[in-house]
């Protein structure tokens, strides 16, 4: 690949000056970055077979085209290996999809992060963590792919805290928020196969505008309904009507308990959908809906999401521990929805 | 370490000329459009603004549209309708 890289170049004396320049220009997320040299950027582009000026995505509301060159530069800065580049590109395609609705999750006071779920053989080949310490530091793929997406949002699209990003709290997932599904041990159909009809041998990423994970504990139940009953009780009360998606992440012990009862992911979704409704009276008393409580509000109920299919069920997390978690989506169904994108790997 | 070059990760925003309609000197007799963004009470706030623009500034009328949701620009039907039916638009968002 010899097409010219058109980005402006800055000569530096060494690593420290490069780092100082990146900080002074506001190009980092606060952590040090890898200096994006041309050879490193070329290696990223080669990994996806894209010319520097190829358009990866277009953010309509910002009228910004995201070129392969800029994705590659930011992926280098984030610390990605070139092999991760197809995953970064697919995630960028996902957040530029009109269904994801970039402007809202990127800008809102509601502080969504880009939850990124990797499925398929690429997850295992590149050592994306799907097990112990699922969201913790220590795995280069999880740490740097999410960081690369965030740096693209910052440096290319202008999603900068305090300016176009007005999050009230933000959350730690805005550094990186990436997991893989534990397909090797899961008894269930993988997420990408369920959502867009991929073959299990395909790889894909699912991006969801997401708040922080909320963990629950159930060490007592030996049944699917028992475990999920605790989940539903935990989900119901912090929930708000109209959220677009929830992601439910079932870790090893709960996964095995639920599967032993023969429940599929569809069964899990249906149970959660039916057991997380709240009364209109509850929503009004807790100021999630306007208006005075009327007698009929005590029996009128609302679900947390519009459809059971809006609940993403993922098998991931440590093998030990009677914990699982759920992750609320951001805002409303008309504002943003999870998007699954096939990862295009360069054929050898 | 020898000197080397690094590449700029940012993009220059694409510049495009934007022409604003001149603000009217007065709202007297003007037709007011109010674009409501679906957030709680945004309709009430804009209704109140519409009343103030009529009673205190002499606007002729005020009508309201509702966006699909608060995170997107006003949809095309609103823009097309507003072009035909009002002279001034007030859009509001509040958190």
Regions found by a protein language model. Give the residues of each.
Chain A
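Non-transmembrane, aqueous-exposed alpha-helical and coiled segments at domain scale
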Residues: 1-348
């Amino acid at each position: 690949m010899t097409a010219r890289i058109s980005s402006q170049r800055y000569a530096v004396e060494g690593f420290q000056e490069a780092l100082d320049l990146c900080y002074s220009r506001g190009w980092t997320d606060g952590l040090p970055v890898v200096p994006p040299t041309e050879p490193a950027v070329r290696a990223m582009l080669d990994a996806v077979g894209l010319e520097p000026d190829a358009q990866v995505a277009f953010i309509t509301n910002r009228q910004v085209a995201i070129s392969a060159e800029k994705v590659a530069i930011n992926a280098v800065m984030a610390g990605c290996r070139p092999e991760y580049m197809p995953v970064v590109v697919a995630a960028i395609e996902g957040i530029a999809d009109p269904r994801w609705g970039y402007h809202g999750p990127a800008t809102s006071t509601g502080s969504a992060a880009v939850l990124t779920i990797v499925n398929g053989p690429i997850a295992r080949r590149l050592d994306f963590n799907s097990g112990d310490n699922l969201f913790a530091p220590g795995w280069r793929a999880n740490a740097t792919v999410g960081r690369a997406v965030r740096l693209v949002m910052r440096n290319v699209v202008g999603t900068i805290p305090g300016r176009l990003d007005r999050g009230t709290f933000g959350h730690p997932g805005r550094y990186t928020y990436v997991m893989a599904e534990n397909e090797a041990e899961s008894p269930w159909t993988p997420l990408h196969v369920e959502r867009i009809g991929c073959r299990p041998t395909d790889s894909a990423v699912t991006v969801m505008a997401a708040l922080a994970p909320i963990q629950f504990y159930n060490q007592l139940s030996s049944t699917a309904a028992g475990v999920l009953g605790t989940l539903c009780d935990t989900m119901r009360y912090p929930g708000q009507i109209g959220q677009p998606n929830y992601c439910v992440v079932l870790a090893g012990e709960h996964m095995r308990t639920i599967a032993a009862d023969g429940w599929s992911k569809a069964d899990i979704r249906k149970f959660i959908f039916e057991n997380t409704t709240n009364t209109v009276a509850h929503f009004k008393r807790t100021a999630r809906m306007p208006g005075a409580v009327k007698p009929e509000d005590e029996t009128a109920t609302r679900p947390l999401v519009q459809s059971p299919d809006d609940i993403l069920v993922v098998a991931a997390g440590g093998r030990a521990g009677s914990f699982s978690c759920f992750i609320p989506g951001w805002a409303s169904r008309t504002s943003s929805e999870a998007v699954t994108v096939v990862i295009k790997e360069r054929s050898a | 370490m020898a000197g080397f070059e690094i590449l700029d990760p940012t993009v220059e925003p694409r510049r495009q000329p934007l022409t604003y309609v001149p603000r009217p000197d007065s709202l007297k007799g003007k037709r007011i459009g109010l674009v409501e963004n679906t957030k709680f009470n945004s309709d009430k706030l804009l209704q109140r603004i519409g009343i103030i623009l009529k009673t205190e500034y002499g606007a002729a009328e005020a009508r309201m549209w509702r966006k699909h949701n608060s995170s997107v620009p006003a949809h095309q039907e609103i823009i097309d309708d507003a072009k035909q039916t009002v002279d001034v638009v007030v859009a509001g968002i509040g958190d």
